[in-house]
Amino acid sequence: MFEITRLTVEHLAAGCVTDCSTPRIGFSLSSDRRGAQLADAELTVGDWSAHVTSGQSAAYVGPALLPFTTYSVRLNATDDAGETATATTAFETGRMETPWKGRWISDPSYHFTEAKVSPVPMVFCKEITTNKPIARARLYATAMGIYEAELNGQKLGEQYFAPGFTSYKSYLQYQTYDVTALLTGDDTLTFTVAGGWAVGSFVFTRKNRVTADRQALLAELRIEYMDGTTETIGTDATWQVSESGPVRMADLYDGETYDATQEISDWHNAAPETLKVTPAITADYGAPVKAHEVRKPVAVMTAPDGETIYDFAQNLAGVVRIKFNGKAGQVVTVRHAEILNPDGSLNTTFLRTAKATATYTCRDGEQTYSPRFSYMGFRYAGVKGVDAKDLEIEAVALYSDVEHSGSFRCSDEMLNKLQSNITWGAKSNFVDIPTDCPQRDERMGWTGDIAVFSPTALYNFELSRFLEKWLRDVKAEQLPTGGIPNTVPVQGYGFPATMPEMAVDWWGDACVLVPWALYEATGSLDVLRMMYPTMQKYVKACCFWAGFGIGKHRYIWHTPSVLHFGDWVAPDVPKMSQWQARSKYTATASLCNTSGTLAKIARILGKTEDAAKYKELSRKVADAYCSVLTDGNGKTKEEFQTAYVLPLYLNMFPENVKAKAAENLVKLVEKNNYKIGTGFPGTPYILFALADNGHADTAYKMLLNTQCPSWLYEVRVGATTVWERWDGLDENGECPIGDDGTDMMISYNHYASGAVGAFLYRRVLGVEPTEAGYRKFKFAPVVGGDITEAEGTVGTPYGVIKAAWKIADGEMTMTVAVPVGTECTVVLPSREEKVLGSGEYTVTAKA
């Protein structure tokens, strides 16, 4: 049977509200007939139609879309055997740049001047009366701060932290709520607005009021009546405002304080507010944060001070939900931590200044509470103020609404646990933006983390909306001289803005590497076109610092090491200054990589002159690396793992010395007892550098090593996510790290070294795209260690790839499901290749 299995608008299967004038419509197909191909797809949107004969998406290019309108979408597909299939969906246009009738409002009497804390949440209220039958009603809302909307006491929508985290000086999202069925005729519309990222304390300096001096609200209720008339009720000076709501404190780091006995009083008129910024206000285009998995505690303990400790057996980003019978005035506190002290109490040392505490003052009777304006990174929760026997408690995971589209499993259960840790690390740090960690006073959009992790992330999740949203901010935050800030959105931490033409290797590389990873996973040119000028400016800034040398030194990146991260958190040296001291190697390899990748992108976009220019630049940088930083015979002048990994993976060594360089890397690995020695730049690539250069056995010995530092050491000592530091806990469960110049930079939920996940999919499982978007892909497992079988799925624009292999009795059995519209090259152990069209196949060969 020929079927349409997926039909999306702007990557959403349902519920899309967009301001895009040319929304993208995507689809995937399935068939039980081998070799099935799409012959024609007729796409109809309203009165417009077009035909698609290749690819899996098309942009709407019909008559201008009207605002506030629902459009039907219909797809009629025909395969090459004449079978047909039909699917329908719909989307809604938002405001489409319609001027707002509502005005920004705030409380001018609230003067928020305290440092390093967040403001008291504001509550806005409007009584609304309607007296005619309603055909359709939509609420459009946004804020400076983070908000929740209620209609007659009922929360609207499922999103946490609306309107989301963006580069507020450039972009601000608004949300759309269908309230047609909720309006009664006499209604109360209420908003609670906390400080969030725009006004509240943020970054490790706890800077506040970065974007606005106080919270502000912009909203419109647009009602279409049955008689054809329309009424718009917008925010203005007739709205009421108060700071006496039940949410007494809300801070992204410190947590939330809620007083259920608090009656909202002191209502007074709001007033128009003039913002310090003028962002483009656009319908949601990212992936909003929502509640996902709910976990119950697996163990309950009592700390020495009497605090009840709950173990949820999983480190995560989220909140607790408590339910109990309380008395008015009773105070319950919930603290959060990733690890315990030896005495069983919560270890909150590594939260630094983040208090990560929820405080709840009870009313009489049964009650349920869960924070709405903060989140924490935790495995353990400590509760005081209520007896354990009287309390029901759950941990609720919060992360962006991204589809979990990939899976990996093999015969080694420790690797399966590593895969789980990687995906939980991703979910914990996909909280509206890609963050570094979810627990301490940071949770920032560090560019280096997602730069190295994005290929792994895209094997596990469908991230088009999530990453495209963040990349808009990368583009917006780029410095005039080309550098990319280390954290995006900047929001109070602007390094390297202080340096002319400043660029930071591997961190700034995110502007090239993340779009490239997204293109490889999806085949979409949109992100490459959007980011191409940004990439060009960035590579130019990198070249500025590489241009100070003379002769063969000209293409060596010469920025002082203190302005780099270098071989960040490499476990073979103990100090931050030592990681940074390796920057000449990491930065020069970075420039080779970004310029080489930019050459590929230029070619894809049809910019042939640019492609030739960047390809030549990449070659010159590679030559300089080998001339200046090696002896010319495959040995680096300073020997450490990353110094070999990067040029091997990036193919920088001449062919006649590559094998020698790989042997030298193997010697370092063997000398280190197959333990990892790379920092952020080298860790994603070390297993590829070994396996793809004839040393798969060494790669597997490193992958399967259980001694510290290694991926499976973390698994062996009980990790449930990936750590920032390889030696975060010793065999006794205690942190052995002393003063290393990083100010207690120890996180147990940091996905960067989980970038090894790409190796699990590409080499252990063996699925890798050979053409962007997996239109063509190969299934070529690299067998090693004691692994006897592996299976997994990979989500693609064409459908789901399913692949599995198993070795038994000297024979290898390989099975693969190839989506309609794609082609798979199966590589057998003998290196023989079989090219397969769509369908399901089983191939056997001598192992």
Where do the protein language model's features map onto the residues?
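C-terminal capping/lid segments that line or modulate ligand- or cofactor-binding pockets
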Residues: L189, Y258, D441-E442, T447, ...
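Alpha-helical support elements that line or immediately flank enzyme active sites
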Residues: A137-A141, L151, V319-E338, F373, ...
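Active-site acid/base region of carbohydrate-active enzymes
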Residues: I146, D236-T238, S242, D390-N421, ...
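Extracellular/oxidizing-compartment recognition motifs
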Residues: M1-R440, G448, R465-E468, T481, ...
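Active-site-proximal structural scaffolding
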Residues: T84, P121, T142, S170-L172, ...
